[in-house]
């Protein structure tokens, strides 16, 4: 199975056709428009034969030289193609930048995690290997929400102080105490302690995301079984699947801004979102959640698909189940290295020549590209912005296509799945040297949090 990419690329990345198209002819200045005499024609033929003979000798010498080059340097004549692991073959390409830009040094931050057994919040300070229980002193719901966001969750669902006398502690357990004068994520704000003055530690729960309850029952195949990607959504205009989307919360779905921009004149009441769907043939009239608001990123550019994300707020909340659930966002400062095996899914065209979407949900694995390689002259020649990332293969074996736009690119983080990209654009579908381009979700976390914060359920 091959998924293939939706929209045409930015103008800078499109093919440029050279010369007149088929069947187009023109007369150049100086062309003769009247008949030529036979004598002139014969003399012209003799001169032409002599010229052709000389050109033939030169051409023969050129072919011989080229064959010698092929024999001595066979690799030089091969087209640039291959998988991500063949990155060294692009060394002759002109890179968009000689080296990756160095980021300014950021203040060291504290790391958090939530114990899955008792939901106690733990912190790691100053690169110490030990995880410390967080004292309840100085705690606030606002800090709890910030921590949930930093872990890739969209909302805070529960928090409280737990008495130390109610939990089992080993004798070596240490604690982290927050200084009320400093920010909650700066390392200097947290001090290791042997005990908590209040006698309480923090219990924290965030919205559930990134889990696949039915994953253990799925075996092989490229047509997707129910529950394999529970956050996959179908964004439909009327009864027609238009784009993919990803469920972030019961009333929030993220998709591509260009999907909404292409149909910006459509009535809001015509949009519906289907979740837990595998086959479109199973959809019945009036099914799906109506869209209450469409919120494209305010900086979206229709010219180069920069900032290509949009949020959809639903009129009614989705009912989460084994087949419907939310995907996690990337954690704070989380980095997925090039070569990471991620998955893209959707109902898009399964072949470049097809003009219809797939009835069954499809998926395929794609490795992440380095932005430097994707912006090289061999691939997209600098068309990518910092809000974009690449995933796929240089040999074009698998990709996304029309109808997949807005859908999820997810990467595993242990047992948790995180939304790393939103299907955005590419050159053609599964073309060699042109992998898929995705909106980089990590660049939009603040906007997603700020937009969804006031009206989450």
Swiss-Prot record:
Q: Write out the catalytic residues in the record.
A: 258 (charge relay system), 308 (charge relay system), 405 (charge relay system)
The record places the following residue ranges in the Cytoplasmic compartment, namely 1-49
Q: Give EC number(s), comma-separated.
A: 3.4.21.-
* Chief location: membrane
- Where do glycans attach? 163, 170, 195, 319, 375
| Bilayer-spanning residue ranges | 50-70
Q: Which cysteines are joined by disulfide bonds?
A: 135-196, 148-206, 209-328, 243-259, 342-411, 374-390, 401-429
Subcellular compartments: Cell membrane
Q: Kindly identify the disorder that the protein's record connects it with.
A: Defects in TMPRSS5 may be a cause of deafness.
Name of the protein this chain belongs to = Transmembrane protease serine 5
């Amino acid at each position: 199975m091959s998924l293939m990419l939706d929209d045409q690329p930015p103008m800078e990345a499109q093919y440029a056709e050279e010369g007149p198209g088929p069947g187009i002819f023109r007369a150049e200045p100086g062309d003769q428009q009247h008949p030529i005499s036979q004598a002139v024609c014969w003399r012209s033929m003799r001169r032409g034969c002599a010229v052709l003979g000389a050109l033939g000798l030169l051409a023969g010498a050129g072919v011989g030289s080229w064959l010698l080059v092929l024999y001595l340097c066979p690799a030089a004549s091969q087209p640039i193609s291959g998988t991500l692991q063949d990155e060294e073959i692009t060394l002759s390409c002109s890179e968009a930048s000689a080296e990756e830009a160095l980021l300014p040094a950021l203040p060291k931050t504290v790391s958090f995690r939530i114990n899955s057994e008792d939901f106690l919040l733990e912190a790691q300070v100053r690169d110490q290997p030990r995880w410390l229980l967080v004292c309840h002193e100085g705690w606030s719901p606002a800090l709890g929400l910030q921590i949930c966001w930093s872990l890739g969750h969209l909302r805070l669902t529960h928090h409280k102080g737990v008495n130390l006398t109610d939990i089992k502690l080993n004798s070596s357990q240490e604690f982290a105490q927050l200084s009320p004068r400093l920010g909650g994520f700066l390392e200097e704000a947290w001090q290791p302690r042997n005990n908590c003055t209040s006698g309480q530690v923090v219990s924290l729960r965030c919205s559930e995301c990134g889990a696949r309850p039915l994953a253990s029952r799925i075996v092989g195949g490229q047509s997707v079984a129910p529950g394999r990607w529970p956050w996959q959504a179908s964004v439909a205009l009327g009864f027609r699947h238009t784009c993919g989307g990803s469920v972030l919360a019961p009333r929030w779905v993220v998709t591509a801004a260009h999907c909404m921009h292409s149909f910006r004149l459509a009535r809001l009441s015509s949009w519906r979102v289907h979740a837990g769907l595998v086959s479109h043939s199973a959809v019945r009239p009036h099914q799906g959640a109506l869209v209450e608001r469409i919120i494209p990123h305010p900086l979206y550019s229709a010219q180069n698909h920069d900032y290509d994300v949009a949020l959809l707020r639903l009129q009614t909340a989705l009912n989460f189940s084994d087949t419907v659930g939310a995907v996690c966002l990337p954690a704070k400062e989380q980095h997925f290295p090039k070569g990471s095996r991620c998955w893209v899914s959707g109902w898009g065209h399964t072949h470049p020549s097809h003009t219809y979407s797939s009835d069954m949900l499809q998926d395929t694995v794609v490795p992440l590209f380095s932005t430097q390689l994707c912006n090289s002259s061999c691939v997209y020649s600098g068309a990518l912005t910092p809000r974009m990332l690449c995933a796929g293969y240089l040999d074009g074996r698998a990709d996304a296509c029309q109808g997949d736009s807005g859908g999820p690119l997810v990467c595993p983080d242990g047992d948790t799945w995180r939304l790393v990209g939103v299907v955005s654009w590419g050159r053609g579908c599964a073309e060699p040297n042109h992998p898929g381009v995705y909106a980089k979700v990590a660049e939009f976390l603040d906007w997603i949090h700020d937009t969804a914060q006031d009206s989450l359920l």
